[in-house]
Amino acid sequence: MSHHHHHHQASLVVAYLLLIFLGFFGVHRFYVGRTISGVVYLLTGGIFGIGYIVDFFLLPSLVCHYNNKHHDHTTVIVSPTPVVYQSGSQHYAPYQPQPYYAQQPIQPQQQQYYQQPYQQQQYQPQPYQPNSPQYQP
């Protein structure tokens, strides 16, 4: 036996129709998933008519809250191949950054060290190029 609950997308028009015609019985509250307050309305005649009037103003937020709670608006796309972006006639592959290989910083020679103060040089990383001679066996 399956216990899946299939929640409907609540409609504001339907909720107002239920409020107008059956609001004193709390049917509109049951419709938007407010079971406890629906029972209270059922037993008290819409809390003696006051809750019936207040719900004319609260109903849009009740419907919105119900829909946000029971319906996820996220779409997930699972693709076994890389996604290719298309703009007109040009195709773009997703950006894939190239790895950088760290190199030892250049140290001054011993004689330079004593003759002048050491000036640190900026390290400028170079992109990995697999066909470069320095990476060939």
Swiss-Prot record:
Localization per Swiss-Prot or TrEMBL: Membrane
Membrane topology: Multi-pass membrane protein
Keyword Membrane attributed: yes
GO CC terms: membrane
Cystine pairs: none
Coiled coil feature spans: none
Predominant subcellular localization, coarse grouping: membrane
Keyword match Signal: no
Transmembrane segments: 12-32, 39-59
Region entry Disordered, spans: 106-137
InterPro entries: TM2 (IPR007829), TM2D1-3-like (IPR050932)
Keywords: Membrane, Transmembrane, Transmembrane helix
TM2 domain segment(s): 9-57
A Pfam cross-reference name: TM2
Family: Belongs to the TM2 family.
Protein name: TM2 domain-containing protein DDB_G0287015
Organism: Dictyostelium discoideum (Social amoeba)
Record lineage: Eukaryota, Amoebozoa, Evosea, Eumycetozoa, Dictyostelia
